[in-house]
Amino acid sequence: MLPPASIWQAVLFSGYDSMSSPQNSPVTDPTFSTPPVATRPAGQRLFLIDGYALIYRAFFALISRPLTTARGENTSAAWGVVNFLQRLTSAHKPEYLGWVHDSGLSFRHERYPAYKATREKLTEELQNDFDTGMERICQILEAYRVPVLSLKGYEADDVIGTLARQGAEQGLDVVIVSGDKDFQQLVRNHVWLLNPGRGGPAGVEESWVSVENGAERLGVPPSRVTDYLAMVGDSSDNVPGVKGIGEKTARDLVSEYGDLEAILAAAPSLTKKRPREALLEHAELARLSKELVTIKQDLPMPLELDVLRVKEADHARLRQIFVELEFNTLARALPDTLVAVATALPGAPEAVAETTRPVTYYVTVDRVEQLSAMLQRARTAPYIAIDTQTVTDPDSPQKIDALRSSLVGIGISVAPGEAYYLPLRHRTLQPLQGDFLLGDESGADSTEAAKPRAKRASKQAEPSSIAARAIAAGSPPALNLPSLDDPSMVELRALLEDPAVPKVAQNSKHHMLVLRRAGITLGGLVSDTMLASYVLDPGRRSHGLDLLALEFIDHAMTSQEDLAGKGKQQLAFDLVPVECARDFSCEIADVTWQLEQQFRPQLVTQHTYELYRDVELPLVGVLADVEWEGIQIDRSLFASLKERFARERQRVEQEIYVAAGGEFNINSNPQLREVLFDRLKLPSSKRTSTGPSTDASVLQELAEAGHELPVLLMEYRELSKLESTYIDALPALVNPHTGRLHTSFNQTVAATGRLSSTEPNLQNIPIRRELGRDIRRGFIPRDGSLLLAADYSQIELRLLAHLSNDPAFVAAFKSGGDIHRQTASLIFDVPLDGVTSEMRARAKTINFATIYGQGAHALSRQLKIAHSEAKEFIERYFERFQGVREYLDSSVTYAREHGYVETIFKRRRYIPELRDRNFNVRAFGERTAANSPIQGSAADLIKIAMINIRDRLLAERLVARMLLQVHDELVFEVPLEELEVVTGLVKHEMENAASLSVPLVVDVGSGRNWVETKH
């Protein structure tokens, strides 16, 4: 909603010289051109913006593909307004600025009830999005300190007209910013009309209207615009005009007779019949139309220049809003207001001169004799924050690969604004005859494999990057500390490994693995700011340091691209000059140190600190061990699978061509669309901007309707995906140094608390189909060992029984029988021995549908039954398990009241969707509120089990190691002689990870490959 209107309303906001623009900034866009000399405002300028019209245009400019946040908030209008303001103020730098809004119905509606009545009403969903956008824009304007002006009973046009008149009378040059032709009537000496055009590479140039060119657009001078519009009307506002009078006739009449009354007086003598009769018949309508289009200039509203004067923006508030709206480039571009305190080592400056930049003490420690003082300072700090910088091995297929990287330097922060950089493996690039010369003054080794990469990168590096500018200026030779295994570095190794020295990091698992490869076992980890952010709000779009710094300490980080360039042109970190690397790494460590101060109190206040301390943090080390260990694959099997998959894909291709009636490019959506919907005339239920959709849901729907081709297309897509994702990719990702596959587990991605894995993703290999089982058959143990897999049985249903405490559900699990058979017996009202396989299958589907909040529509599609029958099943289910329904309802109610739900272990998930105006979004929020405690508790359980199992394996000095976590399953590599012991250990720890009202059951199996563990 807009701020409430009063007689004269101005909500203060401001600041333009410091406004920053987004990437591909339109600030220098030609759409804001310099006006012609003859029409240039030369004095003190007052810009009056027709705000509502601009917002409306920005909202609908992206209506087919709106900008949205991760949480679904439509940001199109907000983005358009910010973009516009930045272009306008950067190009024109006004001294005074006002943003003018309508205040609701005006006197024109009373005078003519049909005024604007033809405007199309927005749908409920669009209206909700528009209203939310208006609220955000008011926040943005307030942060910019731009006054929002309106007057009850009048339109923005009247407010602008009144203020423009007063401004011109007081000697100001007034610029009205609008694309509305009505404003041309206000143009006079010292009053201009500026149509802002559109930004972007295909932008429409702005246009200026002044007294010199005021007649160009409409063909009449500004003083006769109302007379002209009185006759032609205005369809956008439903101003009737005079039927039978067109634009040319109206221009001719104005040119010959002048104002409307003179034209009406001359009407009887007009020689042309049509305009004569029209004017005689509709004279009063013409007078009414002129009244409607005439902008008032005499409202009881004084021009208050102190209010309108451009002021400094509230950058902290702007950054907060931009982060919330995910305008991250804009947020980073705002001036930095980070305040830090410098604490110096002996020899540091005693005082730092006052400056607008952050106060920092970032020191390069590149000599062994400096280390002792720095290490002593670190040991006296309450905690230290660490950062590692690396170069990835040339043979790694990944850009960031902790297990195939070499350590270049370490950043250590001991207090806000105080950090130290320890260079270990920097090389030097110096300018030489327009090129860069790779040097090695430091004495550090430079592999032959790295040299060509360095030379190539140096030639292509963007001169705009910090490192490239430093190199071009002539960086000093790189000095490095000895390698970490040198005897002189023993104190540093001791500090990093000492569990008594508290350490924090951002993405600590990465640093842990990097240091392990360098021979260091990181000890004393007490916090990880990325994990802390995740526990505080798992729904946050990103837990990256740059966004956390913006949101929590109002600081814009230097990015890797800022430092070293981007893409293939990016400099490797060991080629970045040490002084640049120091500032970059120290900033990361420094910000991490400060974020820890922010997050720990919040975790305690939120009652999530125990989950963070006892589950998420210990799991970091467990996952690091799992990733370090890796898993072996049978390369010969994958080679044979590649041949088999190729044959299968070719077979399906031929069947597709037969079903389609000819060959076509199966991977081309336009060609596939033509075959499905033009050639075969299949029904289309979903459209995109380019035509009927061919996505998986459409193919599934067509396949269920009995059409052959969609079935084959789905099979083809599955084969292609398995082939590219696993058959081709997995062998290529094997680490040549270990001969094993090392996945990366992500702790901060899934809002439920579940882990995910990437590079490669080993959690989505299908198990129910033979093709997926063939891929799993390629995962094997070392010689003399077996794979052991332990899987929670029906963990989510058991958790639902515990959380709901439904007597029938709890009893079904305590009896130890088949839960789906027992459910079928209850909902179909038959004895256990009378349950058929079909009844059990339906009961199983209903059990899991309950967890995920599926309604009758989704269930009817799954079971392929009528909607009414599915609805009856659900009603019968909840009649038998009333406690389940009460629990699910109470979970949604709790979420509405508190804004979040919790797991058994107090993990929170915030659900803002419950407050959304959109019904579908709210429904999603309700389903999320119902199932998140169940899914999240399952995630917590297996994490606790992983920690306990790892601890026992180490404590009992067993060789067996955990290799994978796949949802509710853990996979181990176990020597034959340890199999019995480890089987019992794993089963015990998983089944006793928590005490529930129903037993936890774990199925354990072993075999010579992953598939055999299930037999």
Please place each PLM-identified region on the residue numbering.
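C-terminal polymerase-core module
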Residues: 647, 651-654, 658-711, 879-927, ...
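Short hydrophobic beta-strand that contains or immediately precedes a catalytic carboxylate
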Residues: 48-49, 176-178, 384-386, 505, ...
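Non-catalytic nucleic-acid-binding/docking modules located in mid-to-C-terminal regions
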Residues: 12, 20-43, 93-98, 146-147, ...
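Noncatalytic, basic helical substrate-engagement surface that gates or grips nucleic-acid strands
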Residues: 12, 20-22, 26-177, 181-210, ...
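A short, charged helix-loop
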Residues: 202-236, 550-580, 589, 593, ...
